[in-house]
Amino acid sequence: MGSGCRIECIFFSEFHPTLGPKITYQVPEDFISRELFDTVQVYIITKPELQNKLITVTAMEKKLIGCPVCIEHKKYSRNALLFNLGFVCDAQAKTCALEPIVKKLAGYLTTLELESSFVSMEESKQKLVPIMTILLEELNASGRCTLPIDESNTIHLKVIEQRPDPPVAQEYDVPVFTKDKEDFFNSQWDLTTQQILPYIDGFRHIQKISAEADVELNLVRIAIQNLLYYGVVTLVSILQYSNVYCPTPKVQDLVDDKSLQEACLSYVTKQGHKRASLRDVFQLYCSLSPGTTVRDLIGRHPQQLQHVDERKLIQFGLMKNLIRRLQKYPVRVTREEQSHPARLYTGCHSYDEICCKTGMSYHELDERLENDPNIIICWK
């Protein structure tokens, strides 16, 4: 498990009929001081309105995560059993990934109590100490844990690392598989995703995939967004031979990183050709500059492109952030016309977006804007 959510302590707290809220067990022992527990106990053994809810509280440079449980029955002292099995982490730790584990453990202990009085009987409750020890060690070591409770009950737990939200997939974005397409099995995806997978080739944009797969555009965007979240695809811009690119500082990684070199040369070499040389590929990337189109690059470097697929060259460069695209954004300098597509000429909408929204080709849009004295083109 990542160090960002390392568990420092696991505790079991309960409400004692005469002593009130107390820590019954903790692993390691004496980790939670009396002072810390006194500070947070109202969030560990809580009032009814906070019971069965995930609670995270930070105090004294520690973050405690718990899910207070209350089981009401006349067999218990004061007609209720109150307990909480929780985790303690550093105050700065990102603990979102641990919350489902805490919630699940609360549910398991509730079920075990209802079925066999596991928590309320002293003999079985003592089994919590070795269980908590295994939990602490295995979750910290591997992010997963299998807990045999008794002959008929086993608990399986796994920490699911939180992924950052991916960029929003737009109709003019081009999805590209991050690994070999054959590595992904169609059957593991929903029907919409299965329908569009054959059309993801690294060159079709989302709107084109929607049209050719005969799937509603918004459904395609949702499916691509899901693939993005799981890292199955990444997004690049539409490839046109009139496009302009320039290298980023990361292009230097191609010289320093052997594994990146291997991946790049395998990716960009033309099928059936002798393997491309690193020298040629690096020179091609460094030859990209403002004012140089892909068409210009092909005309100026026929020798270097003998074994290099220029489309794959651009695609790989974008995927690995070795290069970036300079896009054209039309800006209308007067406010006279607000018709479609003139309202898109604000400097906030790229050629890719405008062409997708209007159905115009790049050439048609270029001609239209070149003949309009009130339009200027901003490159960014």
UniProtKB/Swiss-Prot annotation:
Record-linked InterPro entries: NPR2-like
Family matches, as Pfam families: NPR2
User: At which residues is there a site annotated Arginine finger?
Assistant: 124
Q: What would changing residue 343 to A do, according to UniProt?
A: Does not affect the GTPase activating protein activity of the GATOR1 complex
What happens upon changing residue 300 to A?
Does not affect the GTPase activating protein activity of the GATOR1 complex
Query: Would you name any one GO CC term?
Result: lysosomal membrane
Instruction: Indicate where the modification Asymmetric dimethylarginine is found in the sequence.
Output: 78
Q: How does it assemble?
A: Within the GATOR complex, component of the GATOR1 subcomplex, made of DEPDC5, NPRL2 and NPRL3. GATOR1 mediates the strong interaction of the GATOR complex with small GTPases Rag (RagA/RRAGA, RagB/RRAGB, RagC/RRAGC and/or RagD/RRAGD) heterodimers. GATOR1 interacts with GPR155/LYCHOS; interaction takes place in presence of cholesterol and prevents interaction between GATOR1 and KICSTOR. Interacts with PDPK1.
PANTHER family cross-referenced by the UniProt entry:
GATOR COMPLEX PROTEIN NPRL2 (PTHR12991:SF10), NITROGEN PERMEASE REGULATOR 2/TUMOR SUPPRESSOR CANDIDATE 4 (PTHR12991)
Q: Hey, which family's this protein in?
A: Belongs to the NPR2 family.
Recorded protein name is GATOR1 complex protein NPRL2
